[in-house]
Design a protein with these regions (language model features):
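Positively charged, small/polar-rich N-terminal and surface patches that mediate targeting and assembly
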Residues: 1-114
Length: 114
């Protein structure tokens, strides 16, 4: 099993959720996060004063899935989150050792939606 974690611009969240549903995902977790990559934050002006915003708002989506579904999930996210501008984000695919559905006690493949 895999955990696909994507961090991207908040404005792309609805498009990513729709793309994941179309790719067969029926479960995900969404978190609001902050961070920076190559863009190193940005400078904003408020009431004539410049302020450096180092940590930019992003959205993190986590999808637990089968090994076979991981690439399909990642491609769906890329298609929906890509604006071809700096700061579009990153996708991390990690191995999951165990998944347990709390309600039923189901484990691993039976406990994930994809």
């Amino acid at each position: 099993m895999k955990l696909v974690t994507a961090i991207f611009k908040p404005s792309r969240l609805d498009a990513v959720i729709d793309a994941l549903a179309a790719a067969g995902s029926s479960g995900l977790t969404v978190s609001e996060v902050r961070g920076y990559g190559r863009q190193q934050g940005k400078t904003e002006v408020y009431r004539g004063a410049e302020y450096e915003v180092r940590l930019l708002p992003k959205v993190q989506v986590d999808v637990a899935c089968s090994d076979e579904a991981a690439e399909r999930i990642a491609e769906a996210i890329i298609g929906a989150a890509n604006t071809e501008t700096i700061g579009d984000g990153k996708i991390f695919i990690r191995q999951l050792d165990t998944v347990i559905r709390i309600r039923t006690g189901e484990r691993d493949e039976q406990a994930v939606s994809v």
